[in-house]
Amino acid sequence: MSVESRLLVIDAGNTSIKFTAFEDDEVLWVQRGESYSADTEFVPDVIYFASVRSKELSALLHADIQAAFPDSKWVTLTSQANACGVTNAYSEPERLGIDRWLGVIAAHHLIREDAVVVDVGTAIKVDVVNKKGVHLGGYIAPGLAMMEESLLSKTARIRYDASEVVAGEGLPNSTARAVSEGCHEMALGFLERIYQRYQDFQWVVTGGDAESLLSLLGVSLERQPNLVAMGAKLLGDEEGRENK
């Protein structure tokens, strides 16, 4: 059970913000967007805030949410050397992205075995944590949309409409398919190399593009769409107990 009964977790990613509401240990609803559409019936006792955005953008979001819920306790989550039974691999632990840290914490508590954590969003993030809770490190690679956007922004004549991206068999026979499927192949190759080394580990996946990409990999895995929010709840609740 949470230290506080009603909890709002804010996961501010690079391109979208995810709001997850908890009542004790139950997820009530999840909302995505650049701003919070207030649920007048839900007033959180506490807000756990995790952001990979700049200090300036994080401060603006903080101010907006605090205006909506002036009486709610606010906790900003940061990456640490040790928390929730997990040891951070980084020599400068605060430099590990908070989204990665929360994913590792949640995966360790869910699996309790050697685990690979994959978050497929703006970037593809992979972290490895052993059954003792030792974070072994990980990787960051461009996500599918980022790869496509980078290619289009750095070339003069690779152009197509989104409507041209349609599934087909065999080698791509259009620019749209060549780019889309080429980026998928790069991402799959990256993940397949990691799988060759860690195929005996449990794989836990999250993120908006996880389903479409990892279904092609043929890996036995556990899907957890709210993994980062679960990690935020674990870390925030631990900090709340320690500060009582």
How does the language model describe each region?
Residues 1-28, 107, 113-135, 151, ...:
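Gly/Thr-rich phosphate-binding beta-strand-loop-beta motif of the actin/hexokinase/Hsp70
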Residues 109-112, 136-177, 235:
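Glycine-rich phosphate-binding loop plus the immediately following alpha-helix
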Residues 221-244:
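Glycine-rich phosphate-binding/hydrolytic loop that grips phosphoryl groups
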Residues 26, 44-47, 71-72, 91-93, ...:
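Active-site regions of enzymes building and remodeling cell-envelope glycoconjugates
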Residues 1-83:
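N-terminal glycine/serine-rich phosphate-binding loop of ATP-dependent small-molecule kinases
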Residues 16, 49-57, 181, 201-217:
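Glycine-rich phosphate-binding loops at beta-strand->alpha-helix junctions
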Residues 76-117, 123-124, 135-136, 171:
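Active-site neighborhood for divalent-cation/phosphate handling
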Residues 167-202, 209-212, 220-221:
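Adenine-nucleotide phosphate-binding core of ATP-dependent small-molecule kinases
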